[in-house]
């Protein structure tokens, strides 16, 4: 039985209690119970019920059969040994629960056994030879348990020459175990015999006799021993071995090699400590430099002095020292801020592009800059006047951005974002023109009108083109009762900053709609291009005043 076909251990059978302590026996053994119903273990587990095992107590159980008190011992199924091995294995007698395993094992009549090892009863081949291992210090008996030649594997006792020859020919002695033709085996043995004869001429070798008849088994080349009567060779002594060793090189050669090596300059401990401290300081400054400072070369600052109100006096190139030349190539960081030089003082940032233009202004004073801005603004205003005004399809055109201003107004602020009506013109009236927003034309716009201290919010919702307002309302229910009208959905992104899902509508165009029906609020909002809604935001509750 191999380890791959091992079956799970089967627990000892449990009695089935039919009532009044009577146990039902069938076939000479107790009927097992279902282990997945009377215990808390899953159905795919083969463990017995610890609850049922604990009810027996001791080593047996007492029952009443025909009014007599009997003490019956638990027993395993009476099956033949072969059938018993088929459905239960002795490979394991332990269970998942240690306590239940001890109790169930104590009830069993069979002692606990070790797991059975797989027994391989393969028929031994008749041609297989058994070799006995012999050592050199054993007494030579002249006999062998091998079925082959008697002198094949007998080791010598104290013959160093024979031991040397055996170690020399020990590697090619074992041949392959698969079947080979008889002629091939004979030729290989002859070649081995010739090699041994050439290497060791004074030793006589004989080829094996039954090599062709013992194919397919472990083959060894026979090593003939010298006669026992031969005298062993004397072993070399320790003094002889020491005399045979080569002499070491003289001391003078080693000293000459040491003197020929050039003397390397050695750094003192003080110099090494100073160098390490300086390197650590520089590395720490480099790592801790500000990430907000520019990382370019110092030549980045050369063309920015023209924006200063009073340009500094630049030194001549020949007056610039080598230290400053090196400092200009270093990245801008905290390392070189201690250098005091006119070229490295604080700079003024260049002027930002005006009116959406990408050109850089190279003007020296503020008067020229103001004149340039005025000229650029006048050209833009003339271009807008030549264009046709947009069609007036609504009550009043209200857009996000104004692109023209009266001439008397300051030119320092090119873009003015306003949402209310244009201011009254001073002097000559200029028609107000509007452009589209940055993200295209918006169909609906929401504007915050007022914010109450109690948390209420007034929002003006205006249509920029025909269509719906873009938000939905629904009747809210709080604690099972109607609570009012709430915003249930916002479909336009332009309304999301002012209108939020869950905001309660209190007023619509100064009309109190709290408690009104949903249809009434819809009729109030419908048919209008702009509506003012007073909301109670759902984010926070109004403060108690």
Curated annotation (Swiss-Prot):
UniProt feature coiled coil, ranges: none
Gene3D superfamilies, A to Z: 2.30.42.10
Domain (PDZ) ranges: 458-540
Region (Disordered): 1-162, 200-250
SMART domains: PDZ
GO biological process assignments: centrosome cycle
Compositionally biased residues, Low complexity: 109-128, 141-152
Domain of life: Eukaryota
PROSITE patterns given in the database record: PDZ
Biased composition (Polar residues): 86-100, 212-221, 228-244
UniProt xrefs under InterPro entries: PAR6_homolog, PDZ, PDZ_sf
Protein name per its UniProtKB record: Uncharacterized protein C09G1.4
Source taxonomy: Eukaryota, Metazoa, Ecdysozoa, Nematoda, Chromadorea
């Amino acid at each position: 039985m191999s380890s791959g076909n091992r079956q799970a251990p089967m627990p000892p059978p449990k009695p089935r209690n039919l009532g009044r302590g009577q146990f039902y026996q069938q076939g000479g053994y107790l009927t097992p119970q279902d282990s997945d119903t009377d215990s808390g273990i899953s159905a795919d587990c083969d463990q017995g019920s610890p609850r049922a095992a604990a009810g027996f107590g001791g080593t047996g159980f007492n029952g009443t059969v025909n009014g007599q008190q009997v003490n019956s011992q638990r027993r395993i199924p009476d099956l033949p040994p072969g059938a018993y091995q088929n459905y239960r294995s002795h490979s394991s007698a332990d269970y998942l629960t240690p306590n239940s395993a001890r109790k169930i094992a104590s009830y069993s009549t069979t002692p606990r056994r070790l797991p059975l090892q797989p027994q391989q009863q393969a028929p031994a081949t008749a041609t297989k030879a058994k070799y006995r291992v012999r050592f050199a210090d054993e007494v030579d008996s002249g006999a062998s348990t091998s079925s082959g030649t008697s002198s094949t594997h007998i080791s010598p006792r104290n013959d160093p020459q024979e031991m040397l020859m055996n170690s020399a020919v020990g590697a090619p002695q074992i041949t392959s175990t698969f079947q080979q033709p008889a002629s091939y085996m004979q030729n290989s043995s002859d070649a081995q015999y010739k090699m041994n004869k050439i290497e060791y001429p004074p030793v006589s070798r004989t080829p094996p006799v039954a090599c062709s008849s013992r194919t397919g088994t472990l083959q060894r080349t026979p090593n003939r021993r010298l006669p026992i009567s031969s005298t062993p060779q004397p072993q070399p002594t320790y003094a002889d071995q020491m005399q045979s060793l080569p002499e070491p090189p003289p001391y003078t050669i080693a000293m000459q090699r040491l003197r020929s090596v050039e003397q390397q300059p050695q750094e003192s401990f003080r110099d090494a400590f100073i160098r390490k401290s300086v390197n650590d300081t520089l590395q720490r400054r480099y790592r801790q430099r500000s990430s907000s400072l520019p990382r370019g070369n110092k030549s980045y600052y050369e063309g920015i002095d023209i924006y200063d109100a009073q340009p500094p006096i630049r030194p001549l190139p020949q007056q610039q020292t080598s230290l400053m030349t090196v400092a200009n190539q270093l990245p801008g960081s905290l390392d070189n801020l201690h250098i005091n030089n006119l070229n490295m003082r604080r700079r003024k940032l260049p002027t930002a592009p005006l009116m959406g233009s990408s050109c850089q202004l190279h003007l020296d004073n503020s008067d020229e800059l103001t004149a340039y801005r005025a000229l650029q603004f006048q050209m833009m205003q003339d271009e807008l006047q030549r264009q046709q005004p947009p069609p007036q399809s609504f009550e009043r055109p209200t857009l996000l951005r104004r692109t023209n201003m009266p001439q008397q107004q300051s030119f320092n602020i090119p873009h003015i974002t306003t949402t209310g009506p244009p201011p009254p013109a001073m002097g000559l009236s200029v028609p107000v023109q509007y452009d589209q927003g940055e993200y295209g034309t918006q169909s609906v716009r929401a504007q915050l009108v007022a914010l109450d201290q109690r948390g209420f919010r007034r929002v003006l919702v205006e249509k920029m083109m025909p269509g719906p307002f873009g938000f939905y309302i629904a009747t809210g229910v709080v604690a099972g009762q109607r609570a009012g009208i709430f915003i249930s959905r916002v479909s336009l992104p332009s309304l999301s900053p002012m209108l939020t899902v869950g905001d309660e509508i209190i007023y619509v165009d100064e009309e109190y709609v709290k408690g009104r029906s949903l249809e009434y609020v819809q009729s109030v909002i419908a048919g209008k291009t702009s509506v003012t809604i007073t909301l109670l935001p759902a984010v926070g509750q109004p403060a108690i005043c």
